[in-house]
């Protein structure tokens, strides 16, 4: 699963997801892409689940690019802990995804196979997604 090797700080504020994605919203590498329609946090496990689906379809013929990286730590406290006494320890990592952000790109496989693969990968995501084809960019 994806996670940063080193970070400046162990813990982060939650923040808020306003507006649409300004960067990473166009196809850059592949021919087909999976684009987010809603804002959300996508965990490293969800990214990995989508990657497994796509690599199964792509095989040796094509190439896959993961365009998001989980760089935000999410902290949790032990259940049954009383209020106070600081913030919990980091449990997992998430990628902050705004609407319009490209999640995955693939290249080197047929249109039919690519749309099928991206559709299944979209089911693994916690948000609504859209499949982009080369001429729709």
Curated annotation (Swiss-Prot):
Q: Which Pfam families match?
A: Ribosomal_L16
One GO location term (cellular component): chloroplast
UniProt record, GO biological process: mitochondrial translation
Alphabetized InterPro entries for the sequence: Ribosomal_uL16, Ribosomal_uL16_bact-type, Ribosomal_uL16_CS, Ribosomal_uL16_dom, Ribosomal_uL16_sf
Q: Does the keyword Amino-acid biosynthesis apply?
A: no
Localization per Swiss-Prot or TrEMBL: Plastid, Chloroplast
Give an example GO molecular function: rRNA binding
Residues of the region (Disordered) are 1-21
- Source domain of life: Eukaryota
Family annotation (CDD domains): Ribosomal_L16_L10e
The record's keywords, sorted A to Z, are: Chloroplast, Plastid, Ribonucleoprotein, Ribosomal protein
Subunit structure of this entry?
Answer: Part of the 50S ribosomal subunit.
Q: Which family does it belong to?
A: Belongs to the universal ribosomal protein uL16 family.
Matching NCBIfam families: rplP_bact
The protein in question is named Large ribosomal subunit protein uL16c
Organism this protein belongs to: Oedogonium cardiacum (Filamentous green alga)
Q: What is the lineage of its organism?
A: Eukaryota, Viridiplantae, Chlorophyta, core chlorophytes, Chlorophyceae
